């Protein structure tokens, strides 16, 4: 089932320097909660400055949903330490609140009033809050409080030059974009390995079912927790963060212009369903527009092609201008075993897997083939640890044991690991391969199995509160390592100044400004 990558691996072993200079970045979301696990109702902590303009700490959907962002980094340890500093400083500056250590929230009732993230009075800030109002009215606020980790990854120019010859200008844009689309297609085919290893949401609180009947064979504990015994990541299931109305958009990942055209079409396509919500009610705007996507970011995807945008530029226009610059992997649950929600083992695994995805052959995929890849993902998400589980290839009927496919993949990853270790020194990548490949013979080693044992004992709430408390105490005590207190103070002041400048510069009334941007 795994494509034959032997030639590409042999090529890589002859050109190990092509992997020198991999760049990455991390984003981690987490809910601020009270000691009893309920959602914090306070505003964004003052010490963290302006969520609109802060370089490292912002908010996602809700005012209580923090998001930490590391700068682009070539050094894994430095990046993780930077992320830990952001957590340390925040833990010391949020009073008695703490960070929820799980992807799935617990003590939130459906219909509970969840305050949307607030960004001040500038048109840009108000637009961001209105977008969130639209998300709430379309999908419900509960779904939007699910949190995850995003891993951003780019291969060095040396890799593309070794692979594609001496490229520059428009030629480089085309070839590098084609290379990243290959990564994305392979990710759709084989990325289910991520929830298999690292999925950490095998259970949900009853509020997530919202009283609706479900065909899933949930088991229920006395404290009202629902779980599937072999599930890995319900966050990635239809109960979690997904969007059914987008499934027939037909966006494909074969060609830059085709992809962008599909995305641009979706933000212009009216939706009958969302038209029913209305645009305005009693003088209050309910969504930016009633199209399938209000803006491009609403497209739900487990992986995204990205380029850093210039001021006022849409994500798709940035891609058209310069091609794909990096990839954003969006399928990681919060790692409950790390105080910062992600660890070195995961980052090293993703490095290996991304390189493998760039090497393995990846035939073009139609939108129907893309839909077929969802079958494997769903199997792994809902019953990934089930003994004897099999997976298919695309829309074909042949089935292969997950256990064997996983081991075959790791045989390749081990060779990538040897190459990366040869240029970085040490055996860190090979060690990660040895640790993780054991999860196929022993699914009890996976994150989902480990966290489920705790959840069955003490419930999602009990587990979340215990981890949150332990991490709060740990992070508050740890000294900063890279950033200093004064760096945070300076960034707080600079971010508040930037927000103020934006608000002062806006002379156009929001309603007028919105007409141009909706």
UniProtKB/Swiss-Prot annotation:
SUPFAM superfamilies documented for this protein: Glutamine synthetase/guanido kinase
Pathway assigned in UniProt: Sulfur metabolism; glutathione biosynthesis; glutathione from L-cysteine and L-glutamate: step 1/2
Main EC class the enzyme belongs to: ligase
Keyword ATP-binding: yes
Catalytic activity: L-cysteine + L-glutamate + ATP = gamma-L-glutamyl-L-cysteine + ADP + phosphate + H(+)
Alphabetized UniProt keyword annotations: ATP-binding, Glutathione biosynthesis, Ligase, Nucleotide-binding
GO cellular component, as recorded: cytosol
EC number annotated for this UniProt entry: 6.3.2.2
GO molecular function list: ATP binding; glutamate-cysteine ligase activity; metal ion binding
Biological process according to GO: glutathione biosynthetic process
PANTHER family associated with the record: GLUTAMATE--CYSTEINE LIGASE
Family assignment from sequence similarity: Belongs to the glutamate--cysteine ligase type 1 family. Type 1 subfamily.
Protein name according to UniProt: Glutamate--cysteine ligase
Organism per entry: Shigella flexneri serotype 5b (strain 8401)
């Amino acid at each position: 089932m795994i494509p034959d990558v032997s030639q590409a691996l042999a090529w890589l072993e002859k050109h190990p320097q092509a992997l020198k200079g991999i760049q990455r970045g991390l984003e981690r979301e987490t809910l601020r909660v009270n000691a009893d696990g309920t959602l914090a109702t306070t505003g964004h902590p003052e010490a963290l400055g302006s969520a609109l303009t802060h370089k490292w700490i912002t908010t996602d959907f809700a005012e209580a949903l923090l998001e930490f962002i590391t700068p682009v980094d070539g050094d894994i340890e430095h990046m993780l330490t930077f992320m830990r500093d952001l957590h340390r400083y925040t833990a010391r500056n949020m009073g008695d609140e703490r960070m929820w250590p799980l992807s799935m929230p617990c003590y939130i009732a459906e219909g509970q009033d969840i305050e949307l993230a607030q960004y001040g009075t500038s048109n840009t800030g108000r637009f961001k809050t209105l977008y969130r109002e639209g998300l709430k009215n379309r999908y419900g606020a509960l779904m939007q409080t699910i949190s995850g980790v995003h891993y951003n990854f780019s291969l060095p120019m040396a890799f593309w030059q070794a692979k594609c010859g001496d490229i520059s200008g428009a030629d480089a844009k085309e070839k590098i974009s084609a290379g990243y689309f290959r990564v994305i297609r392979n990710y759709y085919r084989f990325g289910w390995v991520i929830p298999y290893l690292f999925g950490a949401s095998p259970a949900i609180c009853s509020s997530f079912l919202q009283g609706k009947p479900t065909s899933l064979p949930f088991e229920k504990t006395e404290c009202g927790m629902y779980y599937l015994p072999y599930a890995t990541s319900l966050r990635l299931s239809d109960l979690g963060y997904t969007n059914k109305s987008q499934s027939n958009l037909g966006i494909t990942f074969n060609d830059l212009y085709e992809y962008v055209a599909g995305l641009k079409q979706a933000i212009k396509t009216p939706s009958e369903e969302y038209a029913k919500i209305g645009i305005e009610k009693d003088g209050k705007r309910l969504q930016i527009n009633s199209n399938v996507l209000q803006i491009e970011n609403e497209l739900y995807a487990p992986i995204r092609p990205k380029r850093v945008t210039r001021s006022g530029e849409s994500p798709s226009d940035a891609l058209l201008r310069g091609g794909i610059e990096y990839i954003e992997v969006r399928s990681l649950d919060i790692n409950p075993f790390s105080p910062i929600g992600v660890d070195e083992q995961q980052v090293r695994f993703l490095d290996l897997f991304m390189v493998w995805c760039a090497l393995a052959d990846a035939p073009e995929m139609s939108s129907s083939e893309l839909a077929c890849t969802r079958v494997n993902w769903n199997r792994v998400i809902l019953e990934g640890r089930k003994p004897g589980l099999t997976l298919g290839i695309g829309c074909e009927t042949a089935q292969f044991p997950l256990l064997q496919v996983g081991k075959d993949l790791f045989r390749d990853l081990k060779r990538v690991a040897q190459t990366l270790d040869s240029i970085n020194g040490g055996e860190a990548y090979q060690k990660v391969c040895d640790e993780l490949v054991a999860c196929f013979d022993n699914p009890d080693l996976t994150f989902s199995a480990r966290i489920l044992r705790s959840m069955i004992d003490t419930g999602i709430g009990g587990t979340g509160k215990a981890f949150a408390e332990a991490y709060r105490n740990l992070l508050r005590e740890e000294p900063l390592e890279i950033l200093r207190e004064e760096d945070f103070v300076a960034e707080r002041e600079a971010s508040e100044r930037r927000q103020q400048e934006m608000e002062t510069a806006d002379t156009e009334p929001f309603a007028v400004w919105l007409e141009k941007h909706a």
